[in-house]
């Protein structure tokens, strides 16, 4: 059944309101023990200040926060009284709201149609963002150590590129290991999923598990892993058995690199990775352009000077190539498209950019742990509300107008309307739907993604059919 734009947004409004209405928040606050008796500052007021009206719960003065709360709700609090309400129960309350939102159904109907979706159930993107926090919290949130980071929070996210649905999420210390979380994410794998992983999450065991569970992967290969091919002429013992050390031949990656032109791709179709536990996989080597090489060298120099990490001579020699491993069928993702598909991973960088530049999740003063955590979870809830709204409208714009929405532009515009969303939720779903229709009209007019010359967008790579204005109106599909 094809629903109208208004009907779709009405259903979205009802799902969003389920966990954000004042009555729900009051009941939840009692259930979790944040409120034990009737008082002027309850669950609804905490949500108001941390989610809706303040982006700077961790950096604005308590006097300013009290003023903002009074302006929005009429609740009169002293700075000392407000500070006391930022306690462990408050953190638990906000954490619970965030959990039921991202594990809920908000994004389940936001998947866009694409050629990729006919082959892959979900395109799973995994990455992490990290930011420094007050040094006195180093025992609770030890930092990663880079840039003298003694205390830090790392947020790890895996989401589906088709729908925007959060699949796995973790807030923890900056020193948390990426690879460990990557392994935990395997629990939510489904057959037909495509997992795109960067070097921080590289694990031969994880890639093998994906393959065994009927999922697909595209991953960068760590350069300390050796690539082998089967020896066509192995040595034999007199009894006819193959000598183990002659069974495989090591591939000279540097030799291949030197024979590739910038932008050229080369594939080893039946390769083995690892000295002991060998992973049978496709290996795709992409020769970087001169501009890409210069950017990588600049990044390596920065990493060595700021983080104290020294790159091996082998890594420096192989700066000119990206090495990918994948178990995707060649007929679905030919070698020429592997680099483009891997570049879909950079979409999560856009999401993290909005967290800091628009939602200021990393801004804080020298405050207590509970207030900082209330700020983090309040921002995450606001982020999820805005991003879910963006993914829903992205789908509707594609359905109605065949247009590609700019995620960054759209989230910024939706954030500008957060106060209106808040006011509507206090009333009813019909009023919220009206605000969402206004947002749809705004994003339809001003939210279109800009196209750089000869640069593919996410829709191009995924094979989404859409219209754009280049030299005249055309339809594009990868």
Curated annotation (Swiss-Prot):
The keyword Ion transport does not apply. One of its GO terms (molecular function) is DNA binding. Involved in the transposition of the insertion sequence. It comes from the Bacteria. GO terms for biological process: DNA transposition. Belongs to the transposase 11 family. This is Transposase for insertion sequence element IS231A. Keywords: DNA recombination, DNA-binding, Transposable element, Transposition. The keyword DNA-binding applies.
């Amino acid at each position: 059944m094809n629903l109208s734009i208004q009907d779709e947004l009405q259903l979205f409004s009802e799902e969003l309101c389920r966990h954000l209405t004042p009555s729900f928040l009051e009941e939840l606050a009692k259930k979790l023990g944040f409120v034990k008796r009737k008082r002027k500052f309850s669950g609804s007021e905490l949500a108001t200040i941390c989610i809706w009206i303040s982006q700077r719960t961790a950096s604005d003065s308590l006097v300013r926060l009290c003023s903002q709360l009074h302006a929005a709700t009429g609740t009169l609090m002293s700075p000392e009284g407000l500070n006391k309400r930022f306690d462990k129960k408050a953190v638990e309350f906000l954490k619970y709201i965030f959990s039921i939102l991202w594990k809920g159904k908000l994004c389940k109907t936001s998947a866009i149609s694409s050629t990729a979706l006919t082959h892959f159930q979900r395109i799973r993107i995994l990455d992490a963002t990290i930011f420094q926090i007050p040094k006195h919290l180093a025992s609770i949130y030890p930092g990663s150590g880079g840039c003298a980071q003694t205390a830090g929070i790392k947020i790890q996210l895996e989401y589906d590129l088709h729908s925007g649905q959060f699949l796995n999420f973790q807030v923890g210390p900056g020193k948390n290991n990426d690879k460990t979380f990557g392994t935990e994410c395997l629990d939510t794998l489904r057959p037909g999923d495509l997992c795109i992983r960067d070097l921080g999450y590289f694990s031969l065991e994880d890639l093998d598990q994906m393959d065994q569970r009927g999922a697909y992967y595209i991953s960068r290969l760590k350069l300390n892993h050796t690539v082998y091919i089967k020896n066509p002429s192995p040595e034999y013992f007199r009894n006819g058995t193959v000598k183990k050390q002659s069974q495989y031949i090591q591939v000279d990656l540097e030799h291949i690199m030197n024979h590739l032109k910038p932008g050229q791709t080369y594939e080893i179709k039946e390769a083995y990775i690892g000295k002991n536990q060998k992973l049978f996989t496709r290996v795709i080597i992409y020769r970087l352009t001169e501009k890409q090489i210069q950017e990588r060298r600049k990044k390596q120099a920065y990493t060595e000077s700021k983080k104290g990490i020294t790159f091996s001579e082998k890594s420096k020699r192989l700066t000119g190539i990206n090495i990918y491993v994948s178990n995707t069928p060649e007929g679905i993702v030919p070698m020429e498209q592997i680099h483009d598909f891997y570049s879909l991973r950079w979409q999560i960088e856009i999401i993290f950019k909005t967290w800091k530049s628009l939602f200021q999740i990393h801004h804080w003063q020298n405050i207590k742990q509970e207030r900082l955590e209330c700020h983090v979870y309040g921002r995450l809830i606001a982020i999820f509300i805005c991003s879910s709204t963006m993914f829903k409208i992205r789908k509707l714009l594609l359905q109605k107008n065949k247009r590609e929405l700019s995620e960054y532009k759209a989230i910024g515009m939706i954030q500008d309307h957060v106060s209106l969303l808040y006011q509507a939720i206090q009333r009813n779903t019909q009023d919220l739907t009206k605000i969402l229709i206004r947002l749809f009209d705004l994003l339809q007019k001003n939210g279109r993604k800009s196209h750089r010359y000869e640069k593919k967008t996410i829709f191009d790579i995924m094979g989404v059919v859409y219209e754009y204005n280049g030299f005249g109106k055309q339809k594009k599909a990868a």
